Amino acid sequence: VAAAHRPQLDSLRRVVLGYDGTYLPTVLPGRSLPSEKDAVFKVGHVLFENISDNEAKTLMRTCGIAENTQVSLQQIEEAMRLLRDKYLYMDVTYSVTQDQNHYDLTLRAFHKSKSKVGLGARFDTEDMASVIMGADLVLNTRVPSRLGVVGKLGEQYYVRANFSLEPHLYRTLGFSYEFRNSDMNINHRGRRVYNLSYHRHTVGVSFTHLRLRNFSGEIGIKGTGYDYGDVLSGVYEVDHLKNKFFYSAYTNLRYNSQDKGYYPMRGSKLYVECSYVSDKIADWSRPHAFGVMSASWETISRLSRRFALQPGVRGRVLWGRDIPLPFANAYGGSMAGKYVDQQLPFVGVSRLEPSKAALMVADVKLRYNLLKNHYVTGIFNVAAENDKLSNLPRGRYFYGFGFKYGFDTRFGPIEAMFSYSNNSEKLLFYLGVGFDF
């Protein structure tokens, strides 16, 4: 939950359910659609085909669609999203026909599925090869419920199970368990300083509210246990690293209006999370407890038919003394949360590097759409770190830049990038094939 990122979700959706954030509604041919400038139009009759009466009533009530009222294309897209995400219809279409001074709207759905299983693979120069397997089951219970299981095989492997109850639409009570194995090299200024290996067990309970379009909010509690194997090896010594269990309470808010998980052309993303962590369930005062706040934002602006500008900023701040190593800030790599949940990506740094208690990264990407699915991107990012948020302007600064080529395929992007930073002072090469997970 702490590192829920859109590309990862899109990967699992495509692997398990067969679609992702690039899905666009299918409009039947031979129909008269309102033009883009008439995005809000009057609907006379609303018809449903192969959709149950209860589902139709829920769609109309939730999306605000009614006969003889003004309806927007966004409302129709929201209804179709519900048919796919909530009711698991694999083939959803809509059509509108003009009748005098109004339109008749028809929603069609086919091939409703009770469960889905999937398999995916990925290769990159950071994690080598990895395979993901997943299943999503809709259970036949009085209260709508689901069971999801996802497993990853690779150098960093995990298995995750989620059980959710949805007594009301958009309001979900979830229970989760995850086992994760981590074996990673930790760098400092581009050089390996030690190796860290451990098993992590996480159990959690959460409540999610998804009522507003593009927004979701979540509150929850979770417990996380760390079991260290080969604790540390290398030139650095870290004291007081013991097997331990931590308790945390958190809340987060997400907003995502981007049209695609990879190579979006419009929209923004925002993520904010606050949490409080303690190593004793009966004592939430310092020095046993500490606070965490993390946030990220990015948007995209089309400069022309082929050029797009994508600025972003992300950061994480810790409040407390003697922060345990598993919760310390970290940066590096091409993907957020790849090795640890709190990892912030940074172009020009290939491996995970620990950071001080206050860390902020800003980046800007200039992307050129070379051909239909071919993209060339120039990236520049800069970071600042210090022991306290108030001292961040006087902290250590470092920068990095890179040039990336990407080819977007139905099986995931193929990307190659050269990068450099004054943190590592090395020319780096990265190659990735497949969706991030």
Predicted feature descriptions by range:
Residues 83, 364, 405, 416:
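Hydrophobic, well-ordered secondary-structure elements that form the walls
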Residues 73-74, 85, 91-93, 98-262, ...:
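Gram-negative/organellar outer-membrane beta-barrel architecture
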Residues 250-254, 258-371, 378:
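C-terminal outer-membrane beta-barrel translocator/porin domains of Gram-negative envelope proteins
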Residues 6-123, 134, 148-167, 291-296, ...:
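Periplasmic polypeptide-binding modules associated with outer-membrane biogenesis and secretion
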Residues 397-408:
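C-terminal structured domain segments
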Residues 365-399:
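C-terminal hydrophobic structural anchor segments
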Residues 193, 350-353, 387-393:
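Short, glycine/charged-rich beta-strand-loop motifs at protein surfaces that mediate ligand recognition
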